[in-house]
């Protein structure tokens, strides 16, 4: 599993720590002896039960004073708090802006004031839109939705605070993350989560569009590892793709579930292809994904 021994004894703030990726990160930090603080507004349902060793602050990154409180005496910040679905962001642009843009600004301000050693910002492959793949970090942005714009604005805030105030910030552009605690229900559930839910219920899998859209899926264990490496390196600022470097069509993904299929209208704002070029993360961070998609999917299916 993920190793973070050099983070043992360090005080680490995880914003959005009750969410899918954040809660998995918190579990690993606790296992490895880190003093862990969670900041989350619990605005989305969470089944996470934190260890008694975790300090939980219920509040929003939209509140600067709460960000100051949460970052006090911390060594590192792993910033995952966000309105993190395309559909949700389009339905409520004002909230998306307040959380993803103003919230990130608040956390950066508080991190400077409290002398945080490194902030790791969870960004998104939505930055690339429908550009030709594979996607490389030096590409210009192409925003298909407000969520993509809001997350890219957070990247630029990280760059500014690094240049202006010397705050170490690393931006990780996640591709399609999956694993334990993946959202499974509702219109904004992630595709693998929705597939798992419907397979468990014995229902046909719903594919939006023709199923030829291609996605680069990366396991949450590999994302955790990327966060831990990013927090500990000496790079003052950098942007890195965190994906598998391989993509699959939604039809190919569905075949792994051995279920009946139904097709419906494609969702607006979805990209055609995501595919990460991960050469820079390998070179600068020494990071590479380890969990193959077939392996990860079979394990998830065995647990439903």
Predicted regions and their residues:
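NAD(P)-dependent short-chain dehydrogenase/reductase
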Residues: 133, 146, 156-215, 220-225, ...
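N-terminal Rossmann-like NAD(P)+-binding domain of SDR-like oxidoreductases, especially those catalyzing
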Residues: 1-175, 304
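C-terminal substrate-binding subdomain of Rossmann-fold SDR/epimerase-dehydratase oxidoreductases
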Residues: 5, 200-304
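Gly/Ser/Thr-rich beta-alpha loop segments that engage phosphate groups in nucleotides
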Residues: 18-21, 61, 105, 131, ...
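Activation loop
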Residues: 85, 124-127, 131, 187, ...
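Alpha-helical elements of Rossmann-like donor-binding domains used by nucleotide-donor carbohydrate transfer enzymes
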Residues: 24, 66-69, 73-76, 106, ...
């Amino acid at each position: 599993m993920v190793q973070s021994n050099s983070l043992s004894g360090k005080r680490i703030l995880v914003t959005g720590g009750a969410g899918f990726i954040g809660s998995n990160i918190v579990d690993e930090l606790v296992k490895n002896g880190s003093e862990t603080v969670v900041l989350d507004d619990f605005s989305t349902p969470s089944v996470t039960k934190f260890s008694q060793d975790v300090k939980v602050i219920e509040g929003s990154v939209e509140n600067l004073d709460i960000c100051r409180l949460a970052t006090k005496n911390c060594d590192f910040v792993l910033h995952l708090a966000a309105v993190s679905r395309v559909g949700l962001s389009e339905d409520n642009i004002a909230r998306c802006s307040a959380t993803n843009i103003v919230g990130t600004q608040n956390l950066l301000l508080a991190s400077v004031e409290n002398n945080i050693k490194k902030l790791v910002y969870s960004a998104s492959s939505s930055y690339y839109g429908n550009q030709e793949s594979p996607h490389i970090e030096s590409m210009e942005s192409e925003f298909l939705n407000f969520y993509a714009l809001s997350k890219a604005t957070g990247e630029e805030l990280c760059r500014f605070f690094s240049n202006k105030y010397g705050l170490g910030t690393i931006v990780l552009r996640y591709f399609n993350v999956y694993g334990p605690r993946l959202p499974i229900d509702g219109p904004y559930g992630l595709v693998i989560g929705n597939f798992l839910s419907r397979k468990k219920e014995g229902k046909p899998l719903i594919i939006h569009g023709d199923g030829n859209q291609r996605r680069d899926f990366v396991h949450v264990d590999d994302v955790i590892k990327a966060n831990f490496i990013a927090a500990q390196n000496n790079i003052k600022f950098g942007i890195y793709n965190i994906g598998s470097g391989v993509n699959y069509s939604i039809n190919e993904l569905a075949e792994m579930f051995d279920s009946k299929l139904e097709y419906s209208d494609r969702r607006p704002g979805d990209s055609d292809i995501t595919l990460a070029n991960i050469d820079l993360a390998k070179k600068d961070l020494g990071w590479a994904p380890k969990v193959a998609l077939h392996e990860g999917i079979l394990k998830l299916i065995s647990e439903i």
